[in-house]
UniProtKB/Swiss-Prot annotation:
Highest taxon, organism lineage: Eukaryota
Domain TSP C-terminal: 720-934
Alphabetic keyword roster: Calcium, Cell adhesion, Disulfide bond, EGF-like domain, Endoplasmic reticulum, Extracellular matrix, Glycoprotein, Growth factor, Mitogen, Repeat, Sarcoplasmic reticulum, Secreted, Signal, Unfolded protein response
Protein name as it appears in the record: Thrombospondin-4-B
Gene3D superfamilies given in the database record: 1.20.5.10, 2.60.120.200, Laminin, TSP type-3 repeat
Positions of TSP type-3 repeats: 452-484, 485-520, 521-543, 544-579, 580-602, 603-640, 641-680, 681-716
The gene coding this protein: thbs4b
Residue span of region Disordered: 578-671
Organism from which the protein derives: Danio rerio
The keyword Ribonucleoprotein appears for this protein: no
Domain annotation EGF-like: ranges: 312-349, 365-408, 409-451
Start and end residues of each Laminin G-like domain: 23-198
UniProt-annotated location(s): Endoplasmic reticulum; Sarcoplasmic reticulum; Secreted; Secreted, Extracellular space
Length: 949
């Protein structure tokens, strides 16, 4: 036995040495990228390739980032396989499309690849599916376990137990192209190769990584040991020769002995026949006694074997179940689970191969569009049934509108007058009876003429034949820029102009990308050139300028412009010439978070604009204002509107304008509830007083363009004044967000790959409609972006957030957080507040105790697409807890939460949200005060047994 083992060892060594001399097939993808589609569309499988290598060598400058290479579909810009480096965050991310069609991401932290040095990367992909086996040594025998090994600078750093789908063969209709990093000075991609047909050790040598085979290392072999093994092999063979000679002699002796026994008549001895006994056959009832002995009958249905032993047949391999339905193998038999959502049919059970081959589960599509409710689509709209689902389309011929506002007769507009609007616009009757037209989502113009608006920023792709500003051609057709900023006046908007200031220096390298400065002079080294630096000789990277006088706060001796020098001003960033300070804490009342209680440090740990010294967190009505500061402590009124400034909020004031005419009781109702008019003059007897006929709140903005016609404090959407809230203030996992506000507060851009953070406006709302265009203007990274509403403090708010791919958060403390792709609506009510618990809870898709509740998730599990614009439309009515959010891609409704009821936050402020995602644009932002309860709330209440209003 020992000799046999020596023989096997020597033979295996010879096989290893022979395979180590195999030659690789190597493709240089930098010079021949066109070979890649043929290989991925079946070329590798046809050659029997089961192991594949991708080698790349690159150099990235410190503090920068780049996508090293990416395999993607040029038709829809979707990714198959991508490796990116983030220098500032000191990490790298591998993203890939899984075989189940979902994106996955692996994050490598504390990986300093952006250091100006050359780095070598080797991907070893194993377990590829084979089309015609036998092409290479690796295709012989058992296939390797599918997975990916990542070697960095000749060192194994990660092993994935999954194989990206792109390397298992693409369908012919799935286009694939290669995109490589665009290097700047002092950096670039030096090598990108694809290899197969050899060992990882030999392939690694192409990158000057000289390693021994793992198996050779384990044996500790060298040339001397090989010689010793060969000598031992010769010795063993000689010993085996002697043994065989002896065995031949013994066999001959036995044959002669048997012959002699037969000659003596011993062959007549009675032979005892075996009989059936328990355990002889697979089942006792299968045992048969014959003249020749015992036989076993055939295996029963659902099993295979010789009758003595029978093994269960996996009938599921014959695909008896409806596509998408789970098949459960049993012993014996199989079972198909219920038909998927959108289909109807019976479960299927059976036993045996024949049954599985001749019986297939049948699931019939449910036509949701049949029936009186039109599939749930708005009346008079088109419901399109599809296999397993349905979609709500445009209004039927003769009707106009959309799924939000309903479909009305095309020739009428509320007052039954002829509809003057464009077919792609909505017609609205205002409170004074006038008609306004507004282009629908995905369209832009003046409402009477509408054109296609690809990026949904409010400007048409092509110029329209009308004079309104919104009829002009969009200067960035595919990048939303609702302000149409164009610094160099070349007709190409700053958002899509690679040299926005026209000075010949590209934006990425220009230290004043909106101001021409060929010399790039920078006296203070704060990354802002002198030509655009509001403090030329003082470092101020944030460029903050409170009074907008062109002089940055860092070098302005009167930051708020109130005429008082900073060292004398008790509110340095808030104008207050009176310098009132009731509590004498050195902080003026105008900027004091506790004006009646001394708190010189102005600490506000929960970011609710109320200092910790006077923050009681006692809020009886849940509207975000503590009772001691709430002008209606027992009535929900998050906006705190007090028209007559009498200290009583309008929501609980019987006479809002204090003109002596009650709002609703006799001798009212007041025909101008917000404007004093004791005479109640109404010449046209339309029920609206003359003084407020077209401007109900008398804020000098007519109602039809007023975002809040019943609130004189709010007229237009404006986020220029905002509060920044950092949700993970501790640690150095990432950096804080960088917010840039454009278009007079109606557009926000976040530029950094950052920790979770919020930019929150200071205006609080009760009922509100909030809409905007969401766009990720990069192909780098795949994380969270969204918006918030009902913000009351840094532990209490609603967030709508969208993740592109599935990913486990790279910080496993305090718990493992897994993000799934798709849109999520969450209610945040955190007991800990900003920190690692809230951070991981926001990342995680699902509920987390005492932190976050998932109210709704888009069942499609679809991530956002790179450089694609989406329009959201939110309705929030905190008085009844009504929430509904819709998302559009172009003109198509792609996600709808439906009616969601939650009363955790009874109103609050609005803002935007980001988490580890850079280059996010929130464009064409609009908010409108609206306390009207939508019609679908009544339907929802009836169906769910709630108390109607």
């Amino acid at each position: 036995m020992a000799g046999t083992m020596h023989l096997l060892t020597a033979v295996s060594l010879i096989l290893m040495l022979s395979s180590a001399n195999a030659e690789s097939t190597v493709y240089n993808l930098l010079t021949s990228p066109d070979c890649l589609p043929d290989l991925l569309h079946g070329g590798l499988a046809e050659q029997g390739v089961t192991e594949l290598y991708i080698l790349t060598t690159f150099r990235i400058q410190p503090g920068t980032g780049n996508t090293i290479f990416s395999l993607y579909n040029p038709r829809d810009n979707s990714k198959y396989f991508e490796f990116s480096v983030f220098g500032k965050a000191n990490k790298a991310i591998l993203r890939y499309l899984r075989r189940d069609g979902r994106m996955s991401a692996v994050t490598f932290n504390k990986l300093n690849l952006a250091d100006g040095e050359k780095h070598r990367l080797l991907f070893h992909l194993k377990g590829l599916e084979v089309g015609h086996p036998g092409g290479f040594p690796h295709s012989q025998g058992a296939l390797p376990v599918p997975g990916v090994e990542l070697h960095l600078d000749c060192r194994l750093v990660e092993t994935l137990r999954d194989l990206p789908a792109v390397f298992n063969g693409l369908n012919n209709h799935q286009a694939v192209e290669l995109k490589t990093m665009q290097g700047k000075a002092q950096e670039g991609l030096e090598e990108l190769k694809l290899a197969y047909g050899d060992s990882v050790e030999n392939v690694a040598s192409l990158q000057d990584c000289h390693t021994q085979s793992d198996s050779v290392q384990a044996l500790g072999l060298n040339t001397k040991q090989l010689t010793t093994q060969m000598l031992e092999l010769t010795k063993v063979i000689n010993e085996l020769k002697d043994v065989l000679i002896q065995q031949v002699k013994e066999t001959s002796f036995l044959r002669n002995t048997i012959s002699e026994c037969q000659a003596c008549g011993l062959s007549g001895a009675e032979v005892v026949k075996p009989k059936c006994a328990p355990g002889v056959c697979f089942r006792d009832d299968m045992c048969i006694e014959t003249a020749e002995g015992v036989e076993c009958g055939p295996c029963p249905d659902g099993y295979t074997g010789d009758g003595y032993s029978c093994d269960d047949v996996d009938e599921c391999q014959f695909n008896p179940c409806f596509p998408g339905v789970r098949c459960v193998n049993m012993a014996p038999g199989f079972r198909c689970e219920a038909c998927p959502l959108g289909f109807t049919g019976k479960p299927l059970e059976g036993v045996g191969v024949a049954y599985a081959q001749t019986h297939k589960q049948v699931c019939d599509d449910i036509d949701e569009c049949k029936g009186p409710d039109n599939g749930g689509c708005t009346a008079n709209s088109i419901c399109v049934n599809s296999v397993g689902s349905y979609q709500c389309g445009r209004c039927k011929t003769g009707f106009t509108g959309d799924q939000i506002r309903g479909c009305k007769p095309e020739k009428s507009c509320g007052n039954r007058l002829q509809n003057p609007c464009d077919p792609n616009a909505q017609c609205t009757e205002e409170r004074d009876g006038t008609i306004t037209c507004q282009c629908g989502i995905g369209w832009a113009g003046n409402g009477y003429l509408c054109g296609k608006d690809t990026d949904i920023d409010g400007y048409p792709d092509e110029r329209l034949r009308c004079r309104d500003p919104t009829c002009r051609k969009d200067n960035c057709v595919t990048v939303p820029n609702s302000g149409q900023e164009d610094a160099d006046g070349d007709g190409k908007g700053d958002a899509c102009d690679p040299d926005a200031d026209g000075d010949g220096i590209l934006n990425e390298q220009d230290n004043c990308w909106l101001t021409p400065n060929i010399n790039q002079q920078n006296s203070d080294k704060d990354s802002h050139g002198d030509a655009c630096d509001n403090c030329v000789r003082v470092d101020n990277p944030d460029q903050r300028d409170t009074d907008s006088d062109g002089l940055g706060d860092a070098c302005d001796d009167d930051m708020d412009g109130d005429g008082l020098k900073n060292f004398l001003d008790n509110c340095q960033r808030v104008k207050n010439r009176d310098q009132l300070d009731r509590d004498g804490d050195g902080v003026g009342d105008a900027c004091d978070s506790c004006p009646d209680i001394p708190n010189p440090n102005q600490s506000d740990i929960d970011n609710d604009l109320v200092g910790d010294s006077c923050d009681t967190n006692q809020d009886s009505d849940g509207d975000g204002h503590q009772d001691s500061k709430d002008n209606c402590p027992m009535v929900i009124n998050s906006s705190q509107l007090d028209t007559d400034k009498d200290g009583i909020g309008d929501e609980c004031d019987d006479d809002d304008d204090n003109d002596g005419i009650p709002d609703s009781l006799p001798p009212g109702p007041d025909n101008c509830r917000l404007v004093p008019n004791p005479e109640q003059i109404d010449d046209n007897n339309d029920g609206v007083g003359d003084i407020c006929e077209s401007d109900f709140d008398q804020d000098k903005v007519i109602d039809r363009i007023d975002n809040c016609p019943e609130n004189a404090e709010i007229t237009l959407t404006d986020f220029r004044a905002y509060q920044t809230v950092v949700l993970d203030p501790e640690g150095d996992a990432q950096i804080d967000p960088n917010w840039v506000v454009l278009n007079q507060g109606m557009e926000i851009v976040q530029t950094m790959n950052s920790d979770p953070g919020l930019a929150v406006g200071y205006t609080a709302f009760s009922g509100v409609d909030f809409e905007g265009t969401f766009h990720v203007n990069t192909v780098t990274d795949d994380d969270y972006a969204g918006f918030i509403f009902g913000y009351q403090d840094s532990s209490s708010f609603y967030v709508v957030m969208w993740k592109q791919t599935e990913q486990t958060y790279w910080q496993a403390t305090p718990f493992r957080a897994v993000a799934e792709p798709g849109i999520q609506l969450k209610a945040v009510k955190s007991k800990t507040g900003p920190g690692e618990h809230l951070r991981n809870s926001l990342w995680h898709t699902g509920d987390t105790n005492d932190q976050v509740r998932l109210l709704w998730k888009d069942p499609r599990n679809v991530g956002w697409k790179d450089k694609v614009s989406y329009r959201w439309y939110l309705q929030h009515r905190p008085q009844v807890g009504y929430i509904r959010v819709r998302f559009y891609e172009g003109t198509e409704l792609v996600a709808d939460s439906g009616v969601t009821i939650d009363t955790t936050m009874r109103g609050g402020r609005l803002g935007v949200f980001c988490f580890s995602q850079e280059n996010i644009i929130w464009s064409n932002l609009k908010y409108r005060c609206n306390d009207t309860i939508p019609e679908d709330f009544q339907e929802f209440s009836t169906q769910h047994g709630m108390d109607p209003l």
